[in-house]
Amino acid sequence: MVDEMVLITQQWLNDTYSGKHGYNPVEESGKTGWDTIYGLTRALQIELGISEPADNFGPTTQRLFKPLKRQAPDSKPSNMNFILQGALWCKGFNPGGFTGVFYEKTENAVKEFQKAAGLTTQDGIVTTLIMKALLDMSAFKLVSGGDSRIRQIQQNLNRDYNDYIGLMPCDGLYGRDTNKALIYALQKEEGMSTSVANGFFGNGTTSLCPTLTPGDSRTGFVLIVQYALYCNGKSFDPGEFDGKYGVGVVSAVKAFQEFMCLPQTGYADMPTIKALLSSSGDTTRTASACDTATIITAEKAQTLRNNGYKTVGRYLTGNVRTSSGLTSKALTSKELAVILDAGLKVFPIYQDGGYESSYFVKDQGTRDAYSAASAARRLGFPSGTTIYFAVDFDAYDYEVTDKIIPYFQEIKSAFTKMQTFSTAPKYEIGVYGPRNICIRTSEAGLTKYSFVANMSTGFSGNLGYPMPNNWAFDQFYEGTIGSGSGSIGIDKDGYSGRDSGASNVNPPSDPVYDARLRTLTDILSTIPALENLTSLANAMFEFDTTETIFTSPELDIILSTSLLATIPSEGSPNTITITNGKPGAYITGLLGDTQTSLTASQIDSYQNLLNSLSLSVRNGYLEVYVNPTAESLNIQIKIYTPDIPVGDNVTTGLTTTITFKIKTYKGVPVTSPESELALDWPSYDQYLFPVVGVAALLLIGNMGSDLTNNKGVKVATALSAMLLAIFAYYTS
C-alpha cells in the first residue's frame, strides 16, 4: 500500500540531492524501507558537511548534529526540517505535513515519539538520540504478535539506560536488541562505564553479578531480573515490574530454576541470572550429560564416569577432521558395548553435514532419515529412541522457513513410512540446533525433543529466544577431561530428563538379510541416477516388492526385488554372464556396428558401467530388455545373483529388476491395446528429444526396425540407450 507522504519524501530526496556526491537515489515507491532511510541519512550528512556520506548514523554524524526544536512563526523552510519530517512520516508519526518548518504539529509528533520510546523527557526537542532512532527501521509501536508487557520492558530500558543502549525498538517482540539491552542494563548496575559495557555476558559481568534474595533493596537489579523472567516465557511471570523481590519473584525464579535444572533456591544468583540472559548460562556448572565426536574406549568411559557423566551423545555416522586428517566419529557396536558396560546411557546424533544452508536441499531430509534409521537399527537402538538431526549453523528465520522446516518434514514423512514396516523400530525425531530452530520445528509438530546448541551464545538464533519447552539436552561448554589414554574432548550438556537415552541395545541378527542388502546397495550405487537413492536400501528395506523410486513427467524408475534367483536360459542374446566380478564379454564386441554412433569416451563409459555392475554382482547374470509401448520406451535391467555369500559356506540369492520408463509426450497418436504395436520409434524424435538427447535417438534409430518387429536387441546397445537417456535427462 502506497503512503502518499512517504512518496512525497522520496521524491523530495531525489529532486534535492540527486547528483550530489555521496547520495544514492531512492526508489519512489511510497513504501518505507532501508533504501529510504539510507537516503535520509545521507541527505542529513550532506547538510552537515560530511565529505563522504554513508548509510549509518556514525560517530561523526552524532558529533556534528545539533538539536532541532520548534521555530518562531514565519520561519523559512530548511532541508534539516524536511529530513526530520520525512523521517517522522517513515516512522509512522504525523508531523502535520511536509513543509520544512518546525511548528506545533511537528513538535507534537516528536513528543509522541518520545512517549512511544518510553522517555521521561517529552519536550519535543530532537536530540542526537532522537534523530538517530528516527533514522532506523526499528518500530516504536506495538506490532502484530507483540506483547504489551514486553513493550513496557523496552520502554523502561530506554527510560533508564539510554546512555548505554541508545533507543531500542518498542515493538513488543523479545529479540536480540532487547536481550543485549538487558545485559547493558545489568552492566550499568554493576558499575561498568559506557566505555566498558558491551552487552556481552563475559567474565567481567559474571564476576560482578549479584545474588538477589527476598526483600533485596537493589531496585535496579531486581527490575532486570523481573524483566528477564518475563522475557523467558509467561510461565515465569513475576507479576508487576516494581523492583521489589517479593513472593511473585521468588515463585517465578523457582519455576525457572526447575525448568533449567538449576538448584531451586528462589534466589537470583549468578547461575540463574546468566541463564536468564545468556544461552550458555554458567559454563562452570556441573553436568550429567555430554556429547563427543571421539570414539569412547574403556579408559575414556571411566573418565566420563569419574567426572559425573551418566549420559553421552554419539554420532551414528560420519567423520571429523583432525590434525591427522579425517577420522571416523561413527558409533560402532564394539564402542556401544564399552559405553553400556561402563553404566553409561547413549543418545544418538545424526550429522553428515548440516554446517551451512546449502546442505538443506530437496530430498536431503529423506536421505538422512533412511541413513540415520538404518544405522540406529543396525546398532540395535530400540523403539522409542530419539535420533537428533543436526542443524549446525546460525540459520536466519527465513532459512528456517525455506529450508529447515521442509528438511524435517521430509524426515517425518520418511519415519512415518518406515514405521509401516512390521520389523522396523519406531524411532522419534529430535533436532540439534540453535533455540529458534528447536522452537520452530517443535511448534510445527516435527520434533519430539530438542538438543539445544546453547554454546553458540552469539548466534542470532539464540539471542533473544527462550529455552525450548521440549529441551532434552543443553550443550553449553566445550572442554577436555581426563589424562593419558583416558583424555577425551567433550561438550558439556545440561540434562532435563525428558530423554533418558538408551541403556540397552538389541542388534538384529539376520546375516542372510544383511548379505542381500549389501548386494542391493552395491548394485544401486553403480548405476547412474541411482547412486543418490542407495539410502532406500537400508535396514528397513523389504524384499519381494515393487516400488516406483523416482518419478517425473518424463521418466519413472521402478525397482523390483525377488528372493528367487533363477538362472537365465543359456545362449540368450540379452544375457551377459558374470564370473568373479568380470563380465563375459567386452563392450566393443557387444556393440558391433552401433559403436560407430558413439565417441570413444562414451564407449569407455559403457565399459566402466559394465565393469562396475559386474563387480557388484560378483557371480551371476545381467539381462537387458527394451520394450517400446504407445506411452513409453521401457529399458529393463535384470540382475541375477544366485550365490551371494553369507558365511560358513552358506549362500543366498536375489533378483533385482530396474526399469527405466522413458515417457512419450501428449499429442502422439496412441495405438489401441487390441491392435498390433507398430510404433515407428525413429519418428518420435521431436517428442523424445528433450529427454533422451541426440545420441540416444541415434541408437534408438538404429534399433528402430528391430524394436518394431519385436526382435532381440544387443545388451550393450540397450545399455547405451539407457545410459544416454538417463544422462540426458539428469543434465537437461
From Swiss-Prot:
Localization per record: Cell membrane
Concerning its family, UniProt says: Belongs to the FadG family.
Question: What is this entry's stated membrane topology?
Answer: Multi-pass membrane protein
Q: Which coarse location class describes where this protein primarily resides?
A: membrane
State the name under which the record lists this protein: Uncharacterized protein YbfG
The UniProt keyword set, sorted, is:
Cell membrane, Membrane, Transmembrane, Transmembrane helix
Which SUPFAM superfamilies does this UniProt record tie to the protein?
Answer: (Trans)glycosidases, PGBD-like
GO terms for cellular component: plasma membrane
Q: Which Pfam families match?
A: PG_binding_1, Rv2525c_GlyHyd-like, Ybfg_C
Q: Which residues cross the membrane?
A: 687-707, 712-732
